[in-house]
């Protein structure tokens, strides 16, 4: 830095005449030569400044020097080492100086340069020059330099005599002067204070030397300097480039243009610099001409280049300005303080401080410039050689006619005809003579005005490449040459700064970029560009971009302040930290001084594209009318979708819009003259860009922009692509830092570490605070971004879009209102923080519009708005903002190679959207156009060299180890590998979106509302892994249909609260990665949905409408290439699917606790596989309206509290879905594992079936409407079977030995025919035949017809259908089903109906009792009045007890007294049970909100609660389920096929009054010893659907069941009858039903039904007899009089045809099987009665004793063996029956004794179990009562049969007998021992007697009880030892 010369800050006034100081002539000549050498000696050839080489007329003041050669080495020393710029040659044709002798003080000093030529070269410096620690010369004050020069001249150039003579002459001249020329402190004046200090009578002070006087004289002369430079030419040669940049300046003039004027502020001086004819050309490079061979010069220095040689760029005016600034100084700044004057200065110090000291000293041998000095001296001593060199120079500089003319350059830049004028006005305040002003108040004021005309620039593609290459070289070399910075120097003395005001005015600035590569070959290119540069309005006939800037005004103001390094009153001490002092002083300066400021105003800025044929398209345009085009919506997001504005839109590429700039500006909204006139635009007038910044402080630059419109036409990018492709290879990132530079210690560039610096750094503020300094603040009212994409080519093979004028999709507008952008300064010194904010953008609202081609108005479909406060709240709206930060990314690469990761944080408080179908369609077209445009525009078939190397190691070539190693070696040199990462985080508080979906019937639009809260989007790129990750999370959402009545479709199940810590409703993660070695692109998509409810309402057409709404139009997205591998993962947790029936008020909800699905889709795959795993899947239902949902820990509890009842649950479900992507698209679903559980009551199951039926009706109303006509007559036999006629045959069939398998003589099948498909049978094959089947016996022998079996008709061609493609195949491999039937009722409506009916019956009974008491007699109608049946299942009324009168005769014929007693007993029981306490149901139980938290009576009926029982009464279990379901396409005759098999089927009895365990199970073995085959299926069903017509379908059913074993307890049987006969009352529909929905849909039609024989073995235990049913003629009720054990029957093979409905099918089977059993199998049934069964078994043994010897004799004649077999059978059967009978008698005796003990001992005995209970003794309800004694109560204890837990062997029987006997004997002994004590304790007369009486029966009965039990256990153990198979059956029978 140089101090401002004093002559620039002095007054302008008429200088007085020069004092007559007479200087000797020799001194004048020597002084002139000395001054020239002193100033120019280092920069030009030194010999040219000798006196004999200078043409001068000293008397006239004229000096001229020609042909000066600039010293390149000295100039290069001043170029910073990091700058790769070097001066190769420089010449000055003529240097002229004119001194105005003798009027030196009044006339100007003129200096002129003619033809200045500088050649610079931009090239990479050598490593030696990089490592050279070249430092720039230190700062020197110009005042000190001038003083030092004068001192050197006096003390070194002159001898003592000449010096004394000069000093005396100067002193004498000053004393004799009558006027003080320095009284007003004029330039060059002496700082002598007031005028009185120097007078003619007083000599000069002793401390005033003549050196100061001479320096003042020089300064006063230079104050009148006029400088002129003409014909300046600066050339820049770029290494490896063919063109040369040539800057030409016609003239530079510097002169004083001030007039003598004085005002109140002081006197001013005005100086001006005028620069004319500035131009920049690009000229072709030319070879250097051969130079003169001079051995000595060539060996000592590089050859001098000619004027046309290549050069490097630099600022050619820097040194000229420096030359002027060095000319004059303010002498007051060089005055020495008294302390400095008193101390003699060291001469050596003076020389070292002089900036020209090196020019006076001799060069050192060791320095590089030493040889140059020797060379120069050698040439100057040889005049002949010097003359030859000068002749050669003149010959090279002056062209001859024979020389080839220089190639003409192409003009690039021109400043026009106007000059660049710089005016500087300096004003210094007047100093009064009466007082001394302070040093700081006497500040000069400088005003600088720079005026520039029109600047025009035209860049061709080659020119752009040239400049980019130069910039790349500069950037790369500047980053490489990171030379350590010098240490902070000690602060210099305080110096005042001027008050400076600088203003720059630029009239216009035009930049035209020609992007057409063929323009450079045009013949008239030079003339065209010259014409345009001369007049910018002249068009350029080549396609180009034109940038225009009008009226730029820049102003800089500095108030002038002192910025000292430390306070003036403080002197640094050795122990004081300099940094600490600097910090204190700077803070003081900021507090007390006003900062400087910079202001820039731009009138207008625009960027246009000029195409051929007069086509003009805007690119950037400032349009003040944009913000008045529409009014911003003010409604907050929660107020709906109202408030979306509209604005006019137009395509700027239309032909009719190719006018001036006004054609693309927004016209004011038309109001017309009669409507009040147009909107005033005065507020919009002014600069489009206004910049203001306060310098010297931490304030940022504030940039205010008017409304800005940016037009983005993608076709423009395509037109620019050839230019960009030619430029892109030149743009490359910087190379890694060299190792020699990395080795430099980091502390070398910092200051020295001392204890003081450490303490100072500790007290310094943290570096993060410095890193947060704001750099710029940009504000704009509105920024509009308009994007259009040209229509794609009609043919995909075409690779050109054209001019891009055609438009297919539309235009997208993005309006950003109230934009505020703040950019931070992160390039501050000190330790940088780990993360620093770079920029922050904030805006009020952003609207995104879309307009199709045919639309003239655009409507916004997306608005980013602030989060406005709720009404009534006072709060500042939260504005949307975008923050940009950077931080170093974690990497294993070296520190020099780690790039920073950019973090973009977007906070969007609210988003509003209104999406219509035309908008979606247009956006899809737009996206497709952009995608196809990218494919066309950036399609490049040529592979890069690096890409070819990557392909060698890819999966296409095998990828060997060697290729991998080579790839790893080349990896660090790949520029793309070390890339900066990016993270984008978007936070959205609220989203309010409206979807307007057209209906399928074209009746209007369906409106959907989508709302979401707390939405977060995060995108992150990992450059090292070449991976991009995207995450999306939504905490709360609501998707509803608001077309009419709002219907919620999707949303969070329970309200979102901060305390519940719930997971997001939607979480999406998308990861895309590419393997660079294999070029495999992989996409991973993970979707997690949780805590949501998806509702399916009456209409599901909206699904098709949304699918049609989002469906891309035809021809869109057809050219997208899929990724190589796509992985999709879906996870559902705590999900609910609500199914709302179309016509009923209830609903079903499906709960999903955890579901996980995964699939992989490779590129080109023929099928896709989806694997799903589920756990905790459940189904709940509610009859009416549900209550509110509350937060709970368990999802099922949430719905149960709202009134839902649990119906089904899936514990585990694993499935695999495979779908073919080609051909017919076959779908295969494999369920590998499934566990189902159904829990229901009678009413909830009926409701579920009714709701499911309602769903079925709504899905297809015309299903099964058309049925085939069936001929039905009363005499038609629908049974394709024969009844038996030969009873002898039946007897023979029952006599078949059990050693032979039972065989069906008709089919030839036996039990061995039960094979599974895995054992060799083909799927769908059936083998028939069961023992005991009713058949017809033929009289004669059967003759088999050959080929008969092959010719049988096939009902189902399974094999052919199985091979047909295009079907949907569902296969269940392993599943289990458990159905739990509960007692009680789930719906409050059912319970209320029962309670109301009970009260009604009670009232009727009370009325009847009154009538009977009044003497009236009962009739037959009383029976109907005293009973009622609800829901076809529940009986309420008088008990049908076993008395003769009530049960057999009926109520109408019984005695009035008995009837009165029965009524009284019934009413007493009802009062006892209904008068219970009140209880509060659990929260949420009920049909609606009114049912929640209501008090109900603890209602009981017959001791049973009406609510669902805690435990199930009946459990139905199916395990080992395998199912195959095939659905065939419509063109097939077979529509579907279902094959169902179950390995096990059981019905468990959990009723507490029942002692039997399994109601139904498999038969272990029949009477003939046949057992079940291994792995045989217990249940097998096949259902085939046959398609007759398009809408007609019939079913074919075949079923086969293994032999069954039944243990039927009457309580369980009655429960099942009541449960499945329950018919819920029709639910009142809350919705109006259409006429066609009220009609019942026909049931299924079975074309063919085949049921194979079913063998049964029954144990039945009756408990009640329904005499009413007997009176009605139901003979089946007779079974309740007998116990059945082992009763066998066979339900014969039946084949039916033409059956409609399942109910009719069941009724038909019952009507067919029952008569058959009665007619043909009654004997087998009766033989199962308990007493008869024993006789039958014994009789069977007797028959074997007689018949087996006979049979054996007939067979082989060995009668002994037959007798042995018969005897064994007789003995075994007889012994077993005897033991069984004895055990029963012993058990019965035990029960009688226990009852007697209870009666006599005063204690209630144990329940009598194991015996047939007679008549029920319940208080209320009889026969068919749901809650009578037949079903257990929650309070009852579970009954255990005495036949349960039988001993397995004789040994265990004896042990059990001993244990029982000892227990009872001990009890009797304890009773006897306790009697005396009880007698002693009792007092009174009868107390002891009662104790003895009560103890005696116990003492007697206990041993008897133990004895009977011991006998029973022993006999049972013996029986089980003889018959182990019976023991296994008992385990299944008893609990």
Curated annotation (Swiss-Prot):
Ranges where the record places region Disordered: 286-319, 360-412
Reaction(s) catalysed by this chain's protein: a 1,2-diacyl-sn-glycero-3-phosphocholine(in) = a 1,2-diacyl-sn-glycero-3-phosphocholine(out); a 1,2-diacyl-sn-glycero-3-phospho-L-serine(in) = a 1,2-diacyl-sn-glycero-3-phospho-L-serine(out); a 1,2-diacyl-sn-glycero-3-phosphoethanolamine(in) = a 1,2-diacyl-sn-glycero-3-phosphoethanolamine(out)
Domain Chorein N-terminal: 30-121
Stretches with biased composition (Low complexity): 303-315
Topology of this chain in the membrane: Peripheral membrane protein
Keyword tags: Autophagy, Endoplasmic reticulum, Lipid transport, Membrane, Protein transport, Transport
GO biological process: autophagosome assembly; autophagy of mitochondrion; glycophagy; lipid transport; piecemeal microautophagy of the nucleus; protein transport; reticulophagy
Role description: Lipid transfer protein required for autophagosome completion and peroxisome degradation. Tethers the edge of the isolation membrane (IM) to the endoplasmic reticulum (ER) and mediates direct lipid transfer from ER to IM for IM expansion. ATG2 binds to the ER exit site (ERES), which is the membrane source for autophagosome formation, using basic residues in its N-terminal region (NR) and to the expanding edge of the IM through its C-terminal region. The latter binding is assisted by an ATG18-PtdIns3P interaction.
Protein name as annotated: Autophagy-related protein 2
Organism: Cryptococcus neoformans var. neoformans serotype D (strain B-3501A) (Filobasidiella neoformans)
Lineage: Eukaryota, Fungi, Dikarya, Basidiomycota, Agaricomycotina
């Amino acid at each position: 830095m140089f101090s401002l010369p004093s002559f620039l800050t002095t007054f302008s006034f008429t200088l007085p005449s020069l004092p007559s100081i007479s200087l000797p002539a020799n001194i004048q000549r020597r002084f002139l030569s000395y001054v020239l050498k002193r100033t120019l000696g280092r920069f030009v050839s030194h010999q040219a400044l000798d006196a004999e080489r200078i043409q001068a007329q000293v008397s006239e003041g004229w000096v001229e020097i020609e042909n000066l050669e600039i010293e390149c080495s000295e100039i290069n020393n001043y170029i910073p080492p990091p700058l790769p710029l070097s001066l190769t040659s420089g010449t000055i044709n003529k240097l002229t100086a004119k001194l105005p002798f003798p009027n030196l003080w009044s006339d100007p000093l003129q200096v002129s340069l003619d033809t200045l030529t500088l050649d610079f070269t931009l090239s990479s410096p050598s490593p030696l020059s990089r490592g050279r620690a070249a430092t720039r010369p230190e700062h020197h004050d110009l005042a000190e330099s001038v003083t030092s020069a004068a001192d050197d001249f006096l003390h070194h150039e002159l001898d003592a005599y000449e010096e004394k003579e000069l000093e005396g002459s100067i002193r004498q001249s000053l004393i004799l002067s009558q006027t003080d020329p320095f009284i007003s402190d004029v330039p060059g004046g002496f700082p002598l204070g007031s005028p009185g200090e120097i007078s003619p009578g007083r000599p000069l002070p002793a401390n005033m030397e003549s050196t100061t006087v001479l320096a003042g004289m020089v300064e006063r002369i230079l104050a009148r300097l006029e400088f002129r430079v003409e014909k300046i030419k600066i050339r820049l040669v770029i290494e490896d480039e063919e063109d040369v940049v040539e800057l030409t300046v016609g003239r530079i003039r510097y002169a004083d243009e001030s007039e003598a004027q004085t005002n109140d502020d002081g006197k001013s001086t005005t100086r001006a610099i005028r620069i004319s004819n500035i131009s920049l050309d690009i000229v072709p490079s030319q070879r250097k001409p051969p130079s003169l061979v001079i051995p000595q010069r060539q060996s000592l220095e590089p050859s001098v280049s000619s004027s046309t040689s290549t050069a490097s760029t630099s600022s050619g005016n820097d040194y000229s300005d420096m030359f002027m600034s060095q000319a004059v100084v303010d002498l007051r700044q060089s005055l020495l303080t008294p302390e400095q004057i008193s101390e003699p200065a060291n001469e050596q110090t003076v020389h070292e401080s002089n900036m020209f000291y090196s020019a006076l000293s001799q060069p050192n041998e060791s320095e590089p410039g030493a040889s140059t000095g020797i060379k120069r001296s050698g040439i100057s001593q040889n005049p002949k050689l010097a003359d030859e060199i000068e002749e050669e120079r003149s010959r090279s500089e002056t062209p001859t006619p024979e020389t080839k003319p220089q190639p003409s350059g192409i003009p690039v830049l021109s400043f026009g005809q106007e000059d660049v004028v710089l005016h500087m006005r300096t004003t210094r305040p007047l100093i009064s003579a009466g007082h001394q002003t302070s040093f700081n108040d006497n500040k000069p004021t400088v005003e600088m005005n720079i005026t520039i005309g029109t600047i025009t620039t035209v860049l061709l593609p080659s020119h752009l490449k040239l400049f980019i290459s130069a910039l790349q070289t500069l950037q790369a070399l500047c980053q490489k040459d990171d030379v350590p910075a010098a240490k902070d120097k000690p602060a210099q003395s305080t110096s005042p700064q001027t008050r400076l005001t600088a203003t720059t005015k630029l009239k216009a600035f035009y930049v035209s970029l020609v992007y057409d590569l063929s323009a450079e070959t045009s013949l008239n290119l030079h003339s065209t560009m010259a014409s345009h540069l001369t007049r910018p309005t002249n068009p350029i006939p080549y396609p180009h971009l034109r940038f225009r800037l009008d009226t730029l005004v820049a102003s800089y103001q500095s108030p002038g302040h002192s910025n000292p390094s430390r306070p003036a009153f403080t002197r640094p001490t050795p122990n004081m930290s300099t940094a600490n002092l600097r910090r204190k002083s700077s803070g003081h300066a900021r507090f007390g001084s006003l900062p400087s400021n910079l202001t820039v105003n731009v009138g207008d800025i625009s960027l246009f594209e000029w195409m051929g044929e007069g086509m003009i398209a805007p690119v950037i345009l400032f349009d003040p009318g944009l913000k008045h085009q529409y009014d911003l919506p003010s409604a907050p997001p929660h107020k709906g979708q109202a408030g979306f504005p509209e604005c006019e839109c137009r395509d700027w590429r239309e032909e009719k819009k190719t006018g001036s700039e006004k054609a693309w500006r927004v016209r004011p909204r038309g109001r017309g003259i009669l409507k009040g006139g147009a909107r005033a635009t005065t507020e919009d007038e002014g600069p489009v860009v206004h910049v203001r910044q306060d310098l010297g402080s931490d304030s940022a630059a504030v940039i205010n922009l008017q409304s800005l419109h940016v037009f983005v036409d993608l076709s423009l990018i395509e037109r620019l692509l050839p230019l960009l492709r030619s430029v892109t290879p030149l743009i490359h990132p910087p190379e890694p830092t060299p190792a020699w530079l990395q080795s430099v210690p980091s502390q070398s560039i910092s200051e020295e570490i001392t204890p003081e610096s450490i303490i100072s750094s500790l007290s310094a503020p943290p570096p993060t605070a410095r890193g947060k300094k704001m750099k710029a603040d940009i504000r704009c009212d509105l920024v509009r971004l308009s994007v259009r994409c040209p229509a794609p080519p009609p043919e995909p093979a075409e690779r050109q879009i054209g001019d891009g004028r055609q438009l297919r999709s539309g235009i997208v507008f993005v309006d950003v209102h109230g934009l505020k952008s703040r950019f931070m300064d992160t390039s501050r010194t000190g330790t940088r923080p780990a993360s620093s904010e770079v920029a922050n953008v904030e805006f009020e609202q952003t609207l995104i519009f879309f307009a199709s081609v045919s639309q003239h108005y655009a409507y916004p479909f997306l608005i980013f708005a602030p989060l406005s406060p709720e009404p009534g709240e006072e709060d500042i709206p939260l504005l949307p903002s975008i923050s940009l930060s950077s931080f170093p990314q974690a990497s294993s690469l070296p520190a020099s190679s780690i790039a920073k990761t950019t973090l973009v944080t977007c906070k969007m408080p609210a988003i509003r959207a209104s999406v219509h179908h035309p908008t979606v369609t247009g956006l899809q077209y737009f996206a497709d156009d952009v995608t196809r445009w990218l494919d066309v525009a950036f399609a490049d078939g040529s592979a890069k060299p690096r890409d070819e190397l990557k392909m060698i190691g890819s999966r296409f070539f095998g990828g060997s180890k060697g290729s991998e190693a080579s790839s790893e070696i080349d990896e660090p040199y790949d520029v793309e590998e070390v890339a900066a990462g990016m993270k984008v985080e978007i936070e959205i508080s609220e989203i309010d979106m409206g979807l307007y979906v057209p209906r399928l019937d074209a009746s209007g639009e369906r409106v959907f509302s989508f709302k979401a809260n707390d939405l977060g989007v995060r995108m992150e790129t990992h450059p090292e892994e070449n991976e991009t990750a995207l995450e999306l999370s939504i905490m709360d959402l609501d998707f509803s249909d608001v077309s009419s009545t709002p219907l919620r479709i999707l949303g969070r199940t329970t309200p979102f609260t901060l305390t519940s810590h719930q997971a997001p409703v939607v979480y999406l993660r998308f990861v895309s990665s590419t393997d660079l070695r294999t070029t495999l692109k992989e996409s991973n998509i993970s979707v997690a949905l949780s805590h949501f409810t998806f509702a399916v309402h009456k209409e599901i057409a909206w699904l098709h409408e949304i699918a049609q709404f989002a469906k891309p139009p035809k021809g869109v997205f057809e050219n997208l290439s899929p990724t190589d591998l796509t992985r999709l993962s879906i996870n559902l947790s705590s999900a609910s699917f609500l199914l709302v029936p179309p016509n009923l008020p209830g609903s079903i909800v499906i709960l999903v606790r955890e579901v996980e699905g995964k699939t992989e889709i490779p590129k080109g795959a023929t099928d896709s596989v989806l694997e799903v795993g589920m756990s905790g899947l459940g189904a709940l239902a509610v009859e009416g309206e549900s209550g509110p949902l509350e937060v709970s820990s368990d999802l099922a509890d949430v719905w149960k509290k709202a009134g839902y009842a649990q119906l089904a649950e899936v514990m585990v479900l694993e499935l695999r879905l495979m779908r073919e992507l080609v051909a017919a698209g076959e779908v295969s679903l494999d369920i590998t594992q499934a566990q189902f559980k159904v829990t229901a009551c009678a009413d909830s199951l009926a409701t579920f079936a009714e709701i499911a039926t309602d769903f079925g009706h709504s899905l297809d109303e015309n299903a099964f409407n058309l049925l085939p006509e069936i001929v039905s007559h009363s005499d038609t036999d629908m049974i394709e079977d024969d009844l038996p006629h030969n009873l002898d045959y039946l007897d023979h069939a029952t006599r078949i030995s059990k050693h032979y398998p039972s065989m069906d003589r008709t089919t030839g099948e036996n039990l061995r025919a039960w094979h599974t498909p895995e054992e060799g049978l083909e799927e769908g094959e059936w083998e028939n035949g069961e023992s005991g089947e009713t058949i017809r016996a033929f009289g004669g022998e059967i003759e088999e017809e050959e080929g008969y079996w092959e010719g049988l008709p096939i009902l189902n061609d399974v094999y052919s259908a199985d091979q047909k493609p295009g079907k949907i195949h569902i296969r269940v491999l392993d599943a289990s089903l458990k159905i739990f039937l509960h007692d009680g009722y789930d719906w409050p409506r059912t319970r209320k109906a029962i309670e109301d009916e009970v009260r009604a019956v009670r009232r009727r009974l009370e009325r009847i009792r009154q009538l009977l008491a009044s003497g009236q007699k009962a009739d037959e109608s009383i029976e109907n009045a005293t009973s009622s049946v609800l829901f076809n299942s529940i009986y309420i009324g008088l008990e049908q007890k076993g008395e003769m009168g009530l049960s057999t005769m009926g109520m109408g014929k019984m005695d009035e007294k008995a009837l009165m007693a029965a009524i009284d007993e019934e009413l007493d029981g009802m009062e006892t049970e209904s008068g219970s306490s009140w209880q509060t149901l659990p929260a949420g139980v009920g049909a609606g909100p009114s049912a929640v938290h209501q008090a109900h009576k603890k209602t009981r009926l017959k001791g049973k609660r009406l609510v669902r029982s805690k435990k199930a009464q009946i459990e139905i279990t199916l395990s080992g389920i395998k199912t195959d379901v095939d659905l065939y396409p419509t063109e097939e005759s077979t529509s579907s096929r279902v094959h169902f098999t179950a390995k096990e089927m059981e019905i468990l009895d959990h009723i507490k009054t029942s002692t039997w365990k399994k109601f139904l199970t498999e038969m272990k073995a029949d009477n003939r010893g046949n057992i079940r085959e291994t792995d045989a299926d217990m249940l097998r069903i096949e259902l085939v659907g046959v398609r007759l017509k398009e809408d007609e379908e019939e079913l074919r059913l075949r079923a086969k069941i293994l032999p069954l074993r039944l243990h039927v307890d009457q309580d369980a049987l009655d429960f099942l009858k009541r449960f499945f006969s329950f018919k819920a009352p029709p639910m009142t529909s809350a919705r109006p039903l259409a006429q066609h929905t009220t009609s019942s849909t026909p049931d299924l039609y079975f074309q063919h039904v085949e049921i194979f024989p079913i063998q049964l073995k029954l144990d039945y235990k009756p408990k009640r007899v329904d005499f009413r049913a007997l009176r009605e003629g139901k003979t089946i009720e007779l079974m309740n009089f007998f116990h059945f054990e082992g009763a066998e029957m066979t339900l014969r093979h039946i084949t039916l045809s033409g059956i409609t409905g399942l109910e009719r099918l069941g009724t038909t089977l019952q009507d067919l099987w029952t008569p058959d059993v009665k007619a043909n199998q009654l004997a087998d049934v009766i033989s199962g009665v308990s007493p008869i069964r024993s006789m039958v078994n014994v009789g069977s043994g007797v028959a074997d004793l007689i018949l087996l010897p006979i049979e054996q004799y007939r067979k082989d004649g060995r009668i002994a063996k037959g007798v042995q077999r018969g005897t064994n059978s007789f003995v075994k059967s007889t012994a077993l029956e005897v033991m069984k009978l004895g055990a029963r008698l012993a058990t019965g005796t035990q029960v009688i004794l226990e009852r007697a003990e209870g009666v006599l001992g005063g204690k209630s005995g144990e329940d009598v179990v194991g015996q047939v209970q007679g008549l029920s003794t319940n208080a209320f309800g009889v026969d068919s009562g749901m809650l009578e004694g037949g079903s257990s109560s929650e309070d009852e204890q579970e009954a255990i049969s005495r036949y349960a837990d039988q001993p397995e062997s004789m040994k265990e029987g004896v042990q059990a007998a001993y244990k029982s006997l000892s227990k009872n004997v001990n009890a009797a002994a304890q009773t006897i021992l306790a009697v005396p004590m009880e007698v002693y304790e009792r007092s009174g007369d009868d107390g002891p007697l009662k104790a003895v009486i009560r103890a005696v029966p116990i003492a007697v009965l206990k041993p008897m009880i133990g004895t009977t039990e011991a006998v029973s256990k022993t006999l049972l153990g013996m029986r089980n030892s003889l018959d182990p198979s019976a023991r296994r059956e008992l385990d299944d029978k008893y609990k």
